[in-house]
Amino acid sequence: MAVDFAMNGMMHRAFLRELDRVQGFVESGDTPAARRHYGFFSDLLHQHHEGEDTFLFALVRERSTDPDALATIDALEAEHEQLHAALDTCDDDFSGSGPLPADTVADLKALRMVLAAHCAHEEADGE
Protein backbone atom coordinates (compact mmCIF):
# COMPACT_ATOMS: atom_id res chain seq x y z
CA MET A 1 0.00 0.00 0.00
CA ALA A 2 1.50 3.31 -1.04
CA VAL A 3 1.17 6.28 1.27
CA ASP A 4 1.64 9.79 -0.10
CA PHE A 5 4.38 11.39 1.98
CA ALA A 6 4.44 14.67 -0.02
CA MET A 7 3.01 16.69 2.87
CA ASN A 8 5.60 15.13 5.16
CA GLY A 9 8.33 16.39 2.84
CA MET A 10 7.06 19.94 3.18
CA MET A 11 6.85 19.57 6.95
CA HIS A 12 10.36 18.12 7.09
CA ARG A 13 11.82 21.07 5.20
CA ALA A 14 9.99 23.47 7.52
CA PHE A 15 11.32 21.66 10.60
CA LEU A 16 14.89 21.78 9.34
CA ARG A 17 14.57 25.45 8.35
CA GLU A 18 13.15 26.37 11.76
CA LEU A 19 15.87 24.44 13.56
CA ASP A 20 18.48 26.38 11.56
CA ARG A 21 16.78 29.63 12.62
CA VAL A 22 16.93 28.58 16.26
CA GLN A 23 20.63 27.84 15.95
CA GLY A 24 21.18 31.24 14.34
CA PHE A 25 19.40 32.98 17.21
CA VAL A 26 21.48 31.07 19.76
CA GLU A 27 24.72 31.89 17.95
CA SER A 28 23.80 35.58 17.71
CA GLY A 29 22.94 35.72 21.41
CA ASP A 30 19.22 36.39 20.91
CA THR A 31 18.08 34.00 23.62
CA PRO A 32 14.45 35.23 23.78
CA ALA A 33 13.98 34.64 20.03
CA ALA A 34 15.76 31.29 20.28
CA ARG A 35 13.42 30.19 23.08
CA ARG A 36 10.29 31.32 21.18
CA HIS A 37 11.28 29.64 17.95
CA TYR A 38 12.52 26.50 19.68
CA GLY A 39 9.26 26.18 21.62
CA PHE A 40 7.29 26.43 18.37
CA PHE A 41 9.58 23.93 16.65
CA SER A 42 9.54 21.44 19.53
CA ASP A 43 5.76 21.54 19.98
CA LEU A 44 5.15 20.96 16.28
CA LEU A 45 7.72 18.18 15.97
CA HIS A 46 6.25 16.37 18.98
CA GLN A 47 2.75 16.68 17.45
CA HIS A 48 4.01 15.57 14.04
CA HIS A 49 5.61 12.43 15.43
CA GLU A 50 2.65 11.66 17.64
CA GLY A 51 0.43 11.82 14.56
CA GLU A 52 2.73 9.56 12.58
CA ASP A 53 3.10 7.07 15.42
CA THR A 54 -0.57 7.03 16.37
CA PHE A 55 -2.26 7.23 12.99
CA LEU A 56 -0.04 6.90 9.93
CA PHE A 57 2.26 4.11 11.05
CA ALA A 58 -0.63 2.26 12.71
CA LEU A 59 -2.64 2.51 9.48
CA VAL A 60 0.22 1.11 7.42
CA ARG A 61 0.65 -1.76 9.91
CA GLU A 62 -3.07 -2.48 9.81
CA ARG A 63 -3.43 -2.47 6.04
CA SER A 64 -0.10 -3.69 4.73
CA THR A 65 0.98 -7.26 4.17
CA ASP A 66 4.26 -6.18 2.56
CA PRO A 67 7.16 -7.23 4.82
CA ASP A 68 9.35 -4.45 3.38
CA ALA A 69 6.76 -1.79 4.25
CA LEU A 70 6.46 -3.17 7.77
CA ALA A 71 10.25 -3.25 8.16
CA THR A 72 10.38 0.38 7.02
CA ILE A 73 7.81 1.34 9.66
CA ASP A 74 9.87 -0.51 12.29
CA ALA A 75 12.97 1.44 11.24
CA LEU A 76 11.13 4.77 11.20
CA GLU A 77 9.74 4.12 14.67
CA ALA A 78 13.25 3.32 15.94
CA GLU A 79 14.44 6.59 14.40
CA HIS A 80 11.66 8.41 16.24
CA GLU A 81 13.10 7.05 19.49
CA GLN A 82 16.54 8.45 18.57
CA LEU A 83 14.95 11.75 17.61
CA HIS A 84 13.07 11.97 20.87
CA ALA A 85 16.28 11.44 22.84
CA ALA A 86 17.97 14.30 20.95
CA LEU A 87 14.84 16.44 21.21
CA ASP A 88 14.62 15.82 24.97
CA THR A 89 18.21 17.04 25.35
CA CYS A 90 17.37 20.25 23.50
CA ASP A 91 14.09 20.62 25.39
CA ASP A 92 16.16 20.54 28.59
CA ASP A 93 18.54 23.16 27.15
CA PHE A 94 15.64 25.54 26.49
CA SER A 95 13.74 24.91 29.73
CA GLY A 96 13.84 27.62 32.34
CA SER A 97 14.56 31.28 31.83
CA GLY A 98 18.26 31.65 32.54
CA PRO A 99 21.16 31.56 30.13
CA LEU A 100 21.28 28.68 27.68
CA PRO A 101 23.81 25.94 28.42
CA ALA A 102 27.17 26.22 26.67
CA ASP A 103 26.51 23.05 24.67
CA THR A 104 23.16 24.20 23.23
CA VAL A 105 24.53 24.74 19.70
CA ALA A 106 26.19 21.31 19.75
CA ASP A 107 22.91 19.77 20.94
CA LEU A 108 20.99 21.55 18.16
CA LYS A 109 23.49 20.31 15.57
CA ALA A 110 23.14 16.75 16.88
CA LEU A 111 19.35 17.02 16.70
CA ARG A 112 19.53 18.40 13.17
CA MET A 113 21.76 15.54 12.04
CA VAL A 114 19.37 12.90 13.39
CA LEU A 115 16.32 14.77 12.07
CA ALA A 116 17.77 15.26 8.58
CA ALA A 117 18.71 11.58 8.30
CA HIS A 118 15.26 10.51 9.47
CA CYS A 119 13.51 12.88 7.07
CA ALA A 120 15.59 11.64 4.15
CA HIS A 121 14.85 8.02 5.07
CA GLU A 122 11.14 8.63 5.50
CA GLU A 123 10.90 10.45 2.17
CA ALA A 124 13.00 7.87 0.29
CA ASP A 125 11.60 4.65 1.71
CA GLY A 126 8.27 5.70 3.16
CA GLU A 127 6.41 5.59 -0.11
Question: Which residues fall in each region the model found?
Answer:
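Small-residue-biased structural context
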Residues: 1-127
